[in-house]
């Protein structure tokens, strides 16, 4: 079968021009650290400086990984993460116990957390969470209802 809808991050190199997209949420990726283990400053941190620490990020095939590698490449830097996982929750857990500096979407952060967001001198561009549907597919009534319900909770 084929999927009626795709919920994914954008930019996404796997989505061609044959998809209609709807922005669900705007967000920024942030690097976070437990300051008990990493002496990050309240001043702005350069991307180059981040490379001196163990970086925790999503797996290489994720749109987030692709996006981050491109952002570092744009500054003539090569991003070599220490750990690559398939879960933002696990990245946050590892950062909390001091195993590295994690890169996660800002909406994953909680107030009063042990983690401190790093202020970057070279801010990362914002991204979107989008809903995509293929131009050639007719969206079913069930999918339309799902879209209504899904967008109402965001």
Question: What are the residue ranges of the model-derived segments?
Answer:
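Short, well-ordered beta-strand core segments
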Residues: 6, 55, 100-102
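Acidic, Gly/Pro-rich loop/turn segments at junctions of secondary structure
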Residues: 1-53, 107-110, 124
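Hydrophobic hinge/microswitch elements
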Residues: 2, 64-116
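Active-site-adjacent beta-strand anchor residues
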Residues: 57-58, 84, 102, 132
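A late-sequence structural motif
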Residues: 119-154
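Secondary-structure junction motif
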Residues: 39, 53-75, 139-143, 147
């Amino acid at each position: 079968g084929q999927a009626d809808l795709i919920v994914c991050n954008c930019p996404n190199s796997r989505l061609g021009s044959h998809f209609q997209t709807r922005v669900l949420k705007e967000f920024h990726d942030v690097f976070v650290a437990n300051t008990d283990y990493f002496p990050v400053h309240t001043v702005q941190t350069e991307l180059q400086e981040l490379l001196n620490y163990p970086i925790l990020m999503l797996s290489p095939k994720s749109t987030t990984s692709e996006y981050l590698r491109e952002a570092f490449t744009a500054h003539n830097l090569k991003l070599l993460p220490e750990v690559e996982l398939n879960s933002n929750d696990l990245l946050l857990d590892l950062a909390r116990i001091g195993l590295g500096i994690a890169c996660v979407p800002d909406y994953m952060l909680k107030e009063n957390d042990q983690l401190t967001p790093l202020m970057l001198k070279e801010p990362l561009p914002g991204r979107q969470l989008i809903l995509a549907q293929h131009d050639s597919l007719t969206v079913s009534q069930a999918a339309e209802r799902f879209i209504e319900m899904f967008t109402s909770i965001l």
